[in-house]
Amino acid sequence: MSEKMLQVTQVRSVIGGTKKQKATIKALGLGRPNHKVQIKDNPCSRGQIRVVQHLVKVEEL
C-alpha cells in the first residue's frame, strides 16, 4: 500500500511574514513563489501546511 502524497506549491512570498512562517516554508523545502515539492501526507506535514496556508496551494496526488 503506497502512502498518500501532497504536492505543495508556494504561491506567495514570505516577505513580511513572521520568523515562524519563514522557518516553516524552509522546512517544507520551499523558498520562492511557484516552487513545488511533494511530501508525505501525515499529521506533521498537515500542521506545517496549516501554519502557512495563506502562502501555499495544496493538491493530493
Curated annotation (Swiss-Prot):
<dbReference type="GO" id="GO:0006412">
    <property type="term" value="P:translation"/>
</dbReference>
<dbReference type="InterPro" id="IPR036919">
    <property type="entry name" value="Ribo_uL30_ferredoxin-like_sf"/>
</dbReference>
<protein>
    <recommendedName>
        <fullName>Large ribosomal subunit protein uL30</fullName>
    </recommendedName>
</protein>
<dbReference type="GO" id="GO:0003735">
    <property type="term" value="F:structural constituent of ribosome"/>
</dbReference>
<dbReference type="InterPro" id="IPR016082">
    <property type="entry name" value="Ribosomal_uL30_ferredoxin-like"/>
</dbReference>
<dbReference type="GO" id="GO:0022625">
    <property type="term" value="C:cytosolic large ribosomal subunit"/>
</dbReference>
<dbReference type="Pfam" id="PF00327">
    <property type="entry name" value="Ribosomal_L30"/>
</dbReference>
<keyword id="KW-0687">Ribonucleoprotein</keyword>
<keyword id="KW-0689">Ribosomal protein</keyword>
<comment type="similarity">
    <text>Belongs to the universal ribosomal protein uL30 family.</text>
</comment>
<dbReference type="InterPro" id="IPR005996">
    <property type="entry name" value="Ribosomal_uL30_bac-type"/>
</dbReference>
<comment type="subunit">
    <text>Part of the 50S ribosomal subunit.</text>
</comment>
